[in-house]
Amino acid sequence: MRPQKLILSAFGPFAEETVIDFTRFKDGIFLISGETGAGKTTIFDGICFALYGEPSGSYRKQDMLRSDFAKDETETKVVFLFSHRKKQYKIERNPSYMRKSKRGDKMTRQSPYAVLYQEDEIVTTGSQQVTAQMEEILGMDRMQYQQISMIAQGEFLKLLYAKGKERSEIFRKIFGTWYLYEFQEKIKRRHLSCKYEYLVRAGR
């Protein structure tokens, strides 16, 4: 998957519509830097939220995504354009949040919603439906995507302080080497089985 453009509106610290054009970075590698609280992690939250309906960190929930600085009339949403296997996709998604009613000053809850486009054609609509479709397109769920594609700022501490066995499991998930581990365990079981069979026959 290659990100092309991310549009954040009233999302996290971004009170107004903010556009990040990834196509400007031609070298393939670029650095996202800034002071604490500037919104670096929010960029990853926006991408992960667009794809799977949840932000990148386990400590942030949908109802925490609306910017505290946004005007009442500003819609909270994320638009993410990307390419995958030579196909162009666009996702528009909004979280559940409290907004001002269109009639009067009462506050009402905006329901989560999403639309997935492929080459300007609607593929599916609905928050859960888009998430399910993205899991099928990318071949991984949100947890697998996070472990392979990004380690959020807070989640990185889990890796630093993980014990030996737990750290090994994290790295297996990150680098996709579970199949090697399972193959190794299969060989061990086969070895023990052959060894037992040999000892039984030798005892006879």
Regions found by a protein language model. Give the residues of each.
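Extended, Lys/Glu-rich alpha-helical coiled-coil stalks
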Residues: 30-31, 49, 122, 136, ...
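Extreme N-terminal "head/tail" segments of very large remodeling/mechanoenzyme assemblies
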Residues: 1-132, 142-144
